[in-house]
């Protein structure tokens, strides 16, 4: 029985841990880690410091924007502006199993930006008018992490 308990812990821990982050970031407004409600983008205007502990080892030269997406009722559209050709930007989507289920970057889409439909489990949509790409997650909650390269402290207003 000990081996089964150990295996269950190893299997389930990432999901429980990520849900804990979801709760601190988007549900419990009294948490010191609280960012914004579900389906709302929170933008940081600074790079990560050692005090930022909810997510392990974020980049120290890319301010982050966060959004916990709740796909239980319906899909969501994330709109991204055109990307500057010389600046690293990315949108990474992470499901509750901690798998990356989608990436939007200049390498995957070019620098033009666009509207991206994020759908949860069970949605059977292949195309949608005005949507550049459809990204499907196997879980009903998805973490959207936006990264924008910072070219030094004087560049903060640009990101």
Predicted features along the sequence, with ranges:
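A compositional/structural signature for long, glycine/proline-rich flexible linkers
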Residues: 1-159
């Amino acid at each position: 029985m000990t081996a089964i308990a150990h295996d269950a812990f190893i299997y389930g821990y990432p999901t429980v841990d990520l849900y804990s982050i979801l709760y601190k970031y988007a549900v419990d407004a009294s948490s010191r880690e609280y960012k914004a409600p579900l389906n709302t983008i929170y933008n940081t205007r600074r790079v990560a410091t050692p005090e930022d502990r909810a997510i392990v080892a974020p980049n120290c030269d890319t301010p982050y924007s966060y959004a916990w997406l709740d796909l239980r009722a319906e899909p969501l559209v994330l709109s991204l502006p055109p990307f500057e050709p010389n600046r690293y930007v990315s949108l990474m989507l992470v499901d509750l199993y901690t798998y990356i289920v989608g990436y939007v970057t200049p390498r995957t889409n070019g620098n033009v930006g666009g509207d991206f439909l994020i759908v949860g489990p069970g949605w059977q949509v292949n195309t949608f008018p005005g949507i550049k790409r459809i990204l499907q997650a196997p879980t009903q909650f998805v973490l959207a992490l936006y990264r924008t390269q910072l070219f030094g402290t004087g560049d903060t207003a640009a990101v």
